[in-house]
Amino acid sequence: MFSDTGAFLAQTVEPLMVWDKPWIYGPFAWVFHQHISLWGTVPAQGLICSHLIWVLARVLGRATPMYHLGICAALAAFTAAPWSAGMVMPDILTPVAILCAALLGWGWDGLGRVERIWFSVLGVIATAAHLSNLPVIFALVVLAMLLRLGWQGCLRVALPLAGAVALLLVTNLVGHGRFAVSPYGSTFLLARLIADGPAARTIAARCPEAGWYLCAFAGRLPTNSDVFLWVPESPLNRAPDGKAIFLGGRELAPEASIIIAETLRQEFPAVVADVLRNFVRQLRRSQIGDTLTRHDVGFGVRPVLAKGFPPEEVARFDGSRQMADDLKPLARRLVPLHSLVLLVAAGFALMAWRRAHLARNARALGLLLCILVGITGNALATGALSMPHHRYQARVVWLLPLAAMLFWRLPQSGDEQRRSSPSSASAGTRRASCRNGSPIN
C-alpha cells in the first residue's frame, strides 16, 4: 500500500470525490474487494496482467501454457511486475493501458469478439485511472499514425484515450460540478514549474503588482514539488498568517492556471529544457522500494480500513510485513538483479526491433514499438508533470523484459498467422485428438 491508497479506498467507503484523484481506481478496486478484503483486488490485478501477456503472446504465435507460465515466472522473479501488481494503487493500470492499446491497434485480427470488447472497456478504465496515462496513450496514437496503421487502426488505438477523456469529463461533472478532464490539475503542474524555477521567477517578476496569493511567498517558495504540495507548512497549505488552509491545492487551482500561462509565455524554452531534463531523470529511476515502508503508508489508510472493512482486515493490515518495515530490505536485495535484467533485456529488445524491421513484420514491429514508446512516454509524462520517483517508472519498466522474451525470436510469418487466431489452440487440440483416434465433435 501507499499513502494514496487511503484516498482511493475512501472513494467507495465514504463515498468521496477526492479533489486530486480521478474517481476511477477506487470503484475499480471495489469490484474485487467489495469492502471485505483487499486480497480480492491484488490477485485480480495479477490475473489481468497475465491475461494480457497470454493474448499478446498468442497474436505473436507464441502462446503455449508452459511458455506462458515460464514468462510469468520470469517476470515475477526478475522484474518489478509483482511489486506493482501487488500494490493497491493505479500504478499497474499504466502497463495495462499500454498493452490494451497495442492489442486493439496491432492485434485486432487475432482477438475474439469478447476480447475486443473486454480490452476496449479495460483500456478506457486503465487510461482514466491516472492522469499521466493520457499523454502516454496519446503517444501511441501518434505512433500508429506514423506507422500508417490506417484510419481504422488509429481509431482503435485512440479508443482507450477517447473513452478515458469522456469518462473523466462525466465523473468530474457529477462529482465536482466541473466539465473538465482534471479540474484542479493546474496545481500539480505549477508545483513542478516552481520547483524547476520558471514559475518561481514569474512570481518574483510579477509580484506584488499581480496580486496573486503566492506573491506573499515570492523569493522563498519550496524548490521541491512534493514539499509544495503535501507538507502542512507549505504556502499551499498554510496562509502567511500561519492559518491552515483546507484543500489548499483545490483552492489555488484558478491562480495556478494564470501563473502557468504567464510562465509559458515568458519562459517556454526553459520549460521545455526542464521537461527534457526531468524526462531523463525519470527514465533512470525505476527501482522498487520507495513505497514499501510504514512511513510510505502514512496515517490515512488505517482509518478508512477501520471504517469500511471487517476488523479481520484491519488486523491483517496491522500485522503486515510492510507495517513491520520488513519489505524494503528484501526489495533492496533485488534491485541489482532487476537492473541487470533490464540492461540485458534492452539489448534483446533492440535486436528484436531490428529483426522485425528487416522482416517487414508489421504486426510485431507495431506491438514492440508500442511497448517501447509506452515505456519512454511514461517517463516523459511523469517527469514533466511530477517530481521523478522510482515507482512511476517501475510500474512500466517490466514491459521491457516482457518484450525481450516475446519478440527476440518470433516464428515465421506463416506460422504466426496460423497460431495467432483465438481458436488456434482448440484447433490444435482437435488435430492431436484425431491423430490419437479420438475425434472431438
Functional labels for PLM-detected ranges:
Residues 35-44, 277-371:
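Membrane-interface anchor segments at the N-terminal boundary of transmembrane helices
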Residues 1-8, 16-28, 32-36, 181, ...:
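Extracytoplasmic catalytic/substrate-binding loops of multi-pass membrane glycan-assembly enzymes
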Residues 39-67, 73, 77, 96, ...:
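Transmembrane-helix motifs of polytopic, lipid-linked glycan transferases
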Residues 116-130, 141-142, 160-170:
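Membrane-interface alpha helices of multi-pass inner-membrane proteins
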Residues 182-313:
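Membrane-proximal stem/loop segments at transmembrane-domain junctions that anchor or position
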Residues 101-118:
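Membrane-interface transmembrane helices that cradle and orient dolichyl/undecaprenyl
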Residues 83-93:
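Short acidic/glycine- and proline-prone juxtamembrane loop motifs at membrane-interface regions
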Residues 132-146, 157-161, 182-183:
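Transmembrane-embedded, aromatic-rich helix segments that form part
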